[in-house]
Amino acid sequence: MPMLNAQQFLNQFSLEAPLDESLYPIIRDICQEVKVHGDKALKMYNLTFDHTKTDHLEISHEQIKAAFDTLDEKTKQALQQSYERIKAYQESIKQMNQQLEESVECYEIYHPLESVGIYVPGGKASYPSTVLMTATLAQVAGVENIVVVTPPQPNGVSQEVLAACYITQVNQVFQVGGAQSIAALTYGTETIPKVDKIVGPGNQFVAYAKKYLFGQVGIDQIAGPTEIALIIDDTADLDAIVYDVFAQAEHDELARTYVISEDAQVLKDLESRIAKALPNVDRYDIVSKSIANQHYLIHASNFDEACHVMNTIAPEHASIQTVNPQPYIEKVKYVGALFIGHYSPEVIGDYVAGPSHVLPTNRTARFTNGLSVNDFLTRNTVIHLSKDTFDQIADSAQHIAHVEALYNHQQSILIRQS
């Protein structure tokens, strides 16, 4: 991980396409199989991909409640606190939406989506936080039917995931994962209902299925590997920064970590501490590969250059740990979420800060936003004009219609003026 100056980094900075195009035929075949054969195909794929025989795809409400009831008290309280903070934050956003009406003639009105599917990753780890960071938003929006899909496990779906489903009042939970679960939510099967929108992170198969099926169903985003970029100075706690970097790297060997500073010595000191801590880090195989191939130390010459580098990266997570972080809040524009100060580490945002941890990756923060209650609402523009207002603007409307040679448009106005 050699240190680069800002210009060197920008000259060589590029992101590979987040998806492997060779997966396209596989995804297409899986989706078609689910569309035609429904539950039978899902059970076959559970056996083929997840090595789990599932006689029943749906997990009963009794099982979901039992998972919550038998959960240890400390975990239960942690999940509950996370839920309450997420809910409060999203309710504040929804309240702002209700205050958007500016006139009685033109305004916006919001309606919840009718049904939403949430993908919760499985595999080697359990992710109750994903349930909280997605289903809570749908609940606050007022979505009528919230459906969770998650890969089957030989010992059953994680009790923590089921407990989070109970807390967020998820309607149905199905043990099916991968591209096949996205197809099931898109088309519907004998057991799994068709939904209007699918959200939640997943592997390349999940991401590609969402891309392939978009248009037939709404989606949140096409997620790439996770990433963090930090701007630090000599007041930063470098031991804490080491674990901010490791925390991101342990997600995926393709996870990207960037550290930017105007102080070259700070970067050298951090490099030494990372090298010292790395051999003993948990999840070494994943972290070490990420650090070796996707970790960057970037020396910026001044404040503006540091911000320019950050905006060019447009990371999923940005962290500012400097003596005076406030100026960065306006200058750093293109990030999924901005974490300010020593006591706002990115990891706190993964779990309990309040905003959703489902954020844009792979530079898409330059044109899109993190998941919020708004993603579970439709926004209708209402136009209800008085005769006086119509009379004031009708001539302009009919003239523009005439200029565009849309004479029936023009006549629609003229007939009301007569």
From Swiss-Prot:
Gene Ontology cellular component annotations, sorted alphabetically: cytosol
SUPFAM superfamilies: ALDH-like
Pathway participation: Amino-acid biosynthesis; L-histidine biosynthesis; L-histidine from 5-phospho-alpha-D-ribose 1-diphosphate: step 9/9
Gene Ontology biological process: L-histidine biosynthetic process
Catalytic activity: L-histidinol + 2 NAD(+) + H2O = L-histidine + 2 NADH + 3 H(+)
Binding site for Zn(2+): 248, 251, 350, 409
Cofactor list: Zn(2+)
Active site (UniProt): 316-317
Residue positions binding substrate: 226, 248, 251, 317, 350, 404, 409
Coiled-coil region: none
Taxonomy, superkingdom: Bacteria
Any one GO molecular-function label of the UniProt entry: histidinol dehydrogenase activity
Swiss-Prot/TrEMBL keywords: Amino-acid biosynthesis, Histidine biosynthesis, Metal-binding, NAD, Oxidoreductase, Zinc
Residues the record lists as binding NAD(+): 119, 180, 203
Cofactor note: Binds 1 zinc ion per subunit.
EC number: 1.1.1.23
Top-rank EC class of the record's enzyme: oxidoreductase
HAMAP family: HisD
Entry function: Catalyzes the sequential NAD-dependent oxidations of L-histidinol to L-histidinaldehyde and then to L-histidine.
Family the UniProt entry places it in: Belongs to the histidinol dehydrogenase family.
Record-given protein name: Histidinol dehydrogenase
